[in-house]
Amino acid sequence: MAPILIALVSLISYATTATKQTAPTKTESVAQSRDTSADLEAIGSVIAKYAKSIDSADTSLASQIWWDSPEVSFIHPLGHEHGFDQIKANVYTRLMGETFSERKLTPRDITIHVYGDAAWAEFYWEFNAKFRKDGKPIATHGRETQIYRKMQGNWRIIHVHYSGMPTTQPGQGL
């Protein structure tokens, strides 16, 4: 739990934010700007691999982007997974692999924030799939936050939280 807390504290404690939408501030050096740009690109690549890992229910690909630790977590409408073993078993194998015969996750409107060796991203997504049992299609839309930590030069996912889109009907979504 300590590494995740360190990453979360790092996210809060840094005074400057680098995102895909902002240019370097006057106080940033050119080297810092290049590092941040490279980090934004690397995290964008992690998000693309994440979507591909969901599309193919591929735990090997997931192993390249997740921190293999009992301290990572994944919150989703059907549960809360603790540790990469649970994420592989319950999200990738059971939910994605056994529930759906086809899957396509499309992230959009991605915003990435880098704070040293910690980062987070938020995005909206569209998920299209077919149920394995009867071939019926399903299309859902939602939003997601991912938290990352840079370890040995590589960005790794340490936490995911996703949910459906907000509801606007009275008495719902509370």
Question: Where in the sequence are the language-model features?
Answer:
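Short beta-strand segments enriched in hydrophobic/aromatic residues
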Residues: 66, 125-127, 161-164
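Short, low-complexity N-terminal intrinsically disordered segments enriched in polar/charged residues
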Residues: 16-65, 171-174
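A short acidic/glycine-rich loop-to-helix N-cap element
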Residues: 34, 133-139, 167-172
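Short beta-strand edge/turn micro-motifs at domain boundaries
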Residues: 22-25, 120, 141-168
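Bacterial N-terminal signal peptides
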Residues: 1-13
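A short hydrophobic beta-strand element
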Residues: 117-127
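A solvent-exposed, acidic/Ser-Thr-rich amphipathic alpha-helical stretch
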Residues: 41-42, 59-114, 124, 139
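Beta-strand elements of well-folded, non-transmembrane domains
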Residues: 127-133, 148
